[in-house]
Amino acid sequence: KEFPEDVGLFFVMFMHYLELSPGEAVEIHPGVPHCYLEGECLEAMACSDNVVRAGLTSKHKDVATLLRIVDYPSTSHPKIKLPKEVTKGIKEYPSSYPDFKVVLVESSEEVTLDQGFPFLGIVLEGSATTQHLDLQQGSSYLILEPACIQPTPYLKFYLCGVNS
């Protein structure tokens, strides 16, 4: 609809179509083309010096680089992952990458975040207080040390940190 004459439209026919429910995740390996069509998406990436666009965007497109690095596996859809509860109110998404892990703090009771620092996080719903911060919906935070998080009254807080 937004890019009706973009040649990137043909590329869509070669991609897997997945429909995820809230809270579900997929792990996409380096070099595998991906995009999302609608909704909200949290994307965590390993350290890299490239994001290569080939279409469906008004930003710079680098088709030559994409063709050089692309890895298009002929396997079935990526496996949908759900987070595993680490402790009450804290869930972790399984990651095969040492570079990062994604953690979800979702609670209406106090929780203690005590490992995996530093974390970069965004509050999707609710608010909370910690010893040093007031966490507000729509804001992002850098968490450098253990924190007791007291939701006021509910918190949904996604964090990305080093996978230890």
Predicted segments with their positions:
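Short loop/turn segments at secondary-structure transitions that flank enzyme active sites
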Residues: 34, 48-50, 163
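Short acidic-glycine-tyrosine-enriched beta hairpin
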Residues: 17-37, 42, 105, 129-149
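Extended, charged low-complexity segments
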Residues: 141-164
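C-terminal, non-catalytic macromolecule-binding modules
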Residues: 39-92
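Conserved AWS/pre-SET-to-SET junction and N-terminal core of the SET lysine methyltransferase domain
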Residues: 1-22
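Conserved short histidine dyad/triad with adjacent acidic residue
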Residues: 22, 86-91, 98-116, 145
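Glycine- and acidic-residue-biased ligand/ion/polar-headgroup-sensing regions
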Residues: 1-7, 37-40, 107-137
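N-terminal non-catalytic cap/leader segment that marks the start of a structured domain
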Residues: 100-102, 117, 122, 137, ...
